[in-house]
Structures are given as structure tokens and as C-alpha cells.
Swiss-Prot record:
GO CC annotation terms, alphabetical: cytosol; plasma membrane
EC number(s) stated in the UniProt entry for this protein: 2.1.1.-
CDD domains attached to this UniProt entry: AdoMet_MTases
Annotated disulfide bonds: none
Root EC class: transferase
A Pfam family this chain is assigned to: Methyltransf_11
Entry keywords, A to Z: Methyltransferase, S-adenosyl-L-methionine, Transferase
GO biological process: methylation
Taxonomy, superkingdom: Bacteria
Name of the featured protein: Probable S-adenosylmethionine-dependent methyltransferase Rv3030
Transmembrane segments: none
Length: 274
């Protein structure tokens, strides 16, 4: 998941990208279907994705991990810092070639996520971040995750919260999304596939991002999307704020705590295979 593609030139970020490599011979372009690192203009969406990898990577320590839908590969590489093994699968051949060239710690293969190319009970963790909303047969995919997981293995899923991402719409606002979910729908999808102990969290803007929201008409998200759709130039203040976002600017809050899960930006579910 990422924003609509803005009509702006590519810029390299000054901070270090989240990988062991600083250059890639197979460069992915920003299409609106996936987020990529090292672009100031995409930085908000990238950090919103990256924070979930950072917070949940410890659950992959010394485990065999599958990332189903790896996209650019930065997340699989981050997990490879702690995991015993990381296998990454993506449907897009260009993305697979990019991951193979840029992230040598990751074993990557091209496949349909509805037919995962792994044996039964072969991994301890399946990671699926900002991907399930792109799939046509979500139930089949979740059953495939259950198949390849060992007993007591974890399925970790993040996805945009339908209630806040496409408010008041019958269809997703993002043209690359097939079906978006709310917290109850995601929980039911996992339970129906046989998973248990589903823990749900929500991702929210922290104080600094809430200040940015206030500076940009109430929503820094809407400020970006509005200009991207219109092909309009970004005001310097918006560009500077977007480029300054870090993962520390997001809060991950467990459902039932002091924030309503239905108000979250993204949903994060961790489910156990019996």
C-alpha cells in the first residue's frame, strides 16, 4: 500500500536506507502499488510501513520466516538481521529480480501467493504486511499461510483500516486494492482459516504527526493525496514535513487500550496456528 504516485522528480534521501547495501543495479520505480525507500516524496508511506517491521522483527528472532508479498524487499532484509532464514515471495518478476540483486541475505522466489511454493509446516513465521488488501482470494491465501506454518507458528498481517483509509466508500480508494478490511473482518478471516489467539493492534499518528496534520488542513495524508491526484506541485512546507517523518512518529496501540481500533490508520494482527 502506498499513496497515489505524485508528479515529482525522484530524490535520494540523506539518511541511511534500511539495508546492508547502498545501491541496487535493479531499481524499482514508484508506481503507486508498493512503497519504496530512499524517496523524500514517499517517505511518509515508507516510514508507516517500516515501523511495523521494526516493532515486530523481534518475534522473528532465530526463526525460519516467510515474507509473503515482499515488494521492494527492505522489510525482508530487516527481518534477516534477526531471523535464522528469510524466504521472500512476490508475484512481480521485476520486484523479485530487484530483491535478489539488492538483498543477498534474502532467499527470494516468484510465485502466486494463493499457491505458496513451500512444503507443509516449513516455517515458523509468515509475515504479510500491506499486501492482503491487494489479493483477490484472501481466504485462500490465509489458508495457505496456515499450511506452511509449523505448529504454534505466527501469522503477522498488517493492512489499511478500511474505516479510515476509504471512509464512506463501497470500494477501495486505492485502485490497486481489491478488498480492504476493518478489525472485525480481519479477525474473522484469520479465525475462519483455523488460526487462534488473534491479537489486534492499531497504528496511529503520534504527537509530531498530529502537529503536522494540524499544519496541513487537518490531514497530512489528504494533503499528499490531493496534490498527487491533481498533479499539483507540493508546497515547500508539505515536502519538508513529509521528508522529516520517522518511524518514531507512529504509535502502535493494542486493541482495547486507550484508542479505538476503528480510528486506527492500519491494522496489525498476530495470529497463532494451533
Amino acid at each position: 500500500m502506498c499513496a497515489f504516485v505524485p508528479h515529482v522528480p525522484r530524490h535520494s534521501r540523506g539518511d541511511n536506507p534500511p539495508s546492508a547495501s547502498t545501491a541496487s543495479p535493479a531499481v524499482l520505480t514508484l508506481t503507486g502499488e508498493r512503497t519504496i525507500p530512499d524517496l523524500d516524496i514517499e517517505n511518509y508511506w515508507f516510514r508507516r510501513h517500516q515501523v511495523v517491521y521494526q516493532r515486530l522483527a523481534p518475534r522473528c528472532t532465530a526463526r525460519d520466516v516467510l515474507e509473503a508479498g515482499c515488494g521492494e524487499g527492505y522489510g525482508a532484509d530487516l527481518i534477516a538481521c534477526v531471523a535464522r532464514q528469510v524466504i521472500a515471495v512476490d508475484y512481480d518478476e521485476t520486484a523479485v529480480a530487484h530483491v535478489r540483486s539488492r538483498y543477498p541475505r534474502v532467499e527470494v522466489m516468484q510465485a502466486n501467493l494463493a499457491e505458496l511454493p513451500l512444503p507443509d509446516a516449513s516455517v515458523d513465521v509468515v509475515v504479510n504486511f500491506q499486501v492482503i488488501e491487494h489479493l483477490w482470494d484472501q481466504a485462500r491465501f490465509v489458508r495457505e499461510c496456515a499450511r506452511v506454518l509449523r505448529g504454534s507458528g505466527l501469522l503477522m498481517v498488517s493492512t489499511p483500516n478500511r474505516i479510515t483509509f476509504s471512509p464512506g466508500r463501497d470500494t477501495p480508494i486505492n485502485p490497486f486494492h481489491t478488498r480492504e478490511l476493518n478489525a472485525d473482518e480481519l479477525t474473522s478471516l484469520l479465525i475462519d482459516a483455523g488460526f487462534v489467539d488473534v491479537a489486534m493492534c492499531g497504528l496511529f499518528h503520534g504527537p509530531r504527526l498530529r502537529d503536522m496534520d494540524a499544519r496541513h488542513g487537518g490531514s497530512i495524508i489528504d494533503a499528499q493525496i490531493m496534490r498527487a491526484v491533481a498533479g499539483a506541485p507540493w508546497p515547500p512546507e508539505l515536502a519538508a514535513d513529509v521528508a522529516a517523518v520517522t518511524t518514531a512518529d507512529f504509535e502502535m496501540v493494542a486493541a482495547g487500550h486507550d484508542r479505538d481500533i476503528d480510528d486506527s490508520l492500519d491494522l496489525i494482527a498476530i495470529a497463532v496456528r494451533p
